[in-house]
């Protein structure tokens, strides 16, 4: 996983805890989760736009 092991993840978590504080961690985690969900939702969309021609009434009828 990107060359990051358990000791590195623990160090990163401790640094985040010191920088942001324990009170803001749930808020940050929620925002991060929402961002990831939105990114996945956007990337699941179609890459091309489908254009359907409009049906026009035939004036000769």
UniProtKB/Swiss-Prot annotation:
Organism for this UniProt entry: Geobacter metallireducens (strain ATCC 53774 / DSM 7210 / GS-15)
Coiled coil: none
Membrane topology: Single-pass membrane protein
InterPro entries: TatA/B/E, TatA/E
A Pfam family that the UniProt record links to this protein: TatA_B_E
Transmembrane annotation, as ranges: 1-21
Disulfide-bonded cysteines: none
Main function: Part of the twin-arginine translocation (Tat) system that transports large folded proteins containing a characteristic twin-arginine motif in their signal peptide across membranes. TatA could form the protein-conducting channel of the Tat system.
A GO BP entry: protein transport by the Tat complex
Protein name: Sec-independent protein translocase protein TatA
Family: Belongs to the TatA/E family.
Subcellular location: Cell inner membrane
GO cellular component, one term: TAT protein transport complex
GO MF annotation: an example: protein transmembrane transporter activity
UniProtKB keywords: Cell inner membrane, Cell membrane, Membrane, Protein transport, Translocation, Transmembrane, Transmembrane helix, Transport
Oligomer and partners: The Tat system comprises two distinct complexes: a TatABC complex, containing multiple copies of TatA, TatB and TatC subunits, and a separate TatA complex, containing only TatA subunits. Substrates initially bind to the TatABC complex, which probably triggers association of the separate TatA complex to form the active translocon.
HAMAP family: TatA_E
Gene that this sequence comes from: tatA
């Amino acid at each position: 996983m990107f060359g990051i092991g358990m000791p590195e993840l623990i160090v990163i978590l401790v640094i985040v805890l010191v920088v942001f504080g324990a009170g803001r961690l749930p808020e940050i985690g929620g925002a991060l989760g929402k961002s990831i969900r939105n990114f996945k939702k956007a990337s699941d969309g179609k890459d091309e736009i489908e254009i359907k021609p409009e049906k026009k009434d035939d004036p000769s009828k």
